[in-house]
Design a protein with these regions (language model features):
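A short, structured beta-strand-centered segment in the mid-to-C-terminal lobe
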Residues: 2-3, 7-10, 206-216
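Substrate-binding/active-site clefts of carbohydrate-active enzymes
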Residues: 1-48
Length: 233
């Protein structure tokens, strides 16, 4: 871990983040596993690292002033409060919190056989018990498409055709659930091969009617989501 008590460390990280947004025009930045930094050694029992908390607040406030359209996202699975509250209200100042709980519960539900789902409905409803504590982002990200985890379409229950039907239901649920949406490339046309940074996506599968139809479906519901303020605010 970085020693955020040192000025040179803070300067290096802040300058790097600003450089990525300024020169490469990234849409935003995700800070990975922030609990490892917020708590000493990543252990809540050891208490909060005040140097790190102060650093995150100052960095986020500065980045938002310089890059007001960039999204600053925190990946965190703990209950540390005010992740997305403004710094002025003693928050960390992130725009969104990566909702790992929603992602894991949702994917578990859709890989469960339909006749068993009546015993797992809480996986769809639990997110609303905490959802308004923060501003959440719903992620189907690169993390779920690498290292033998299988792609989103592969995770669905059923045979080849059933997986596409399940995946349509999955995305309709995602797009109508409160929160910002994030969908990793390849998911939108049902790619079965995991992501490989050394290869481009398997665009040729769009010649198959079932993949092409799924791609058009995602395009259509994305348009509906973007055109209706209640679905994307």
């Amino acid at each position: 871990n970085f020693n955020h008590a040192k000025g040179e460390t803070r300067s290096f990280i802040q300058s790097s983040a600003n450089f990525w947004l300024d020169k490469f025009h990234f849409d935003g930045l995700r800070m990975d596993a922030i609990s490892r930094a917020i708590y000493w050694g990543g252990d809540p029992a050891r208490g909060v690292n005040g140097y790190t908390v102060e650093f995150i607040k100052n960095m986020n406030k500065g980045l938002q002033e310089r890059h007001p359209t960039a999204m600053l996202i925190a990946e965190d699975s703990t209950s540390y409060p005010k992740i997305t509250a403004p710094v002025e209200y003693d928050g960390l100042g992130f725009d969104y919190k990566w909702d790992l709980g929603w992602m894991n519960d949702t994917l578990d539900y859709f890989r469960t056989p339909p006749w068993e789902r009546c015993n797992h409905y809480h996986k769809l409803t639990f997110s609303m018990a905490y959802f308004y504590n923060e501003l959440f982002l719903l992620p189907f990200s690169h993390d779920e498409n690498v290292h033998g985890k299988a792609t989103i379409i592969q995770k669905m229950y059923g045979d080849y055709e059933e997986k596409f039907m399940q995946c349509r239901a999955l995305y309709m649920y995602m797009y109508t659930h409160p929160g910002k949406k994030l969908n990793f490339m390849g998911n939108e046309f049902g790619q079965f091969r995991e992501w490989d940074e050394n290869r481009e996506q398997d665009w040729e599968i769009l010649h198959y009617p079932i993949h092409d139809a799924f791609h058009k479906y995602i395009k259509q519901i994305s348009g509906i989501c973007c055109s209706r303020k209640a679905l994307h605010c």
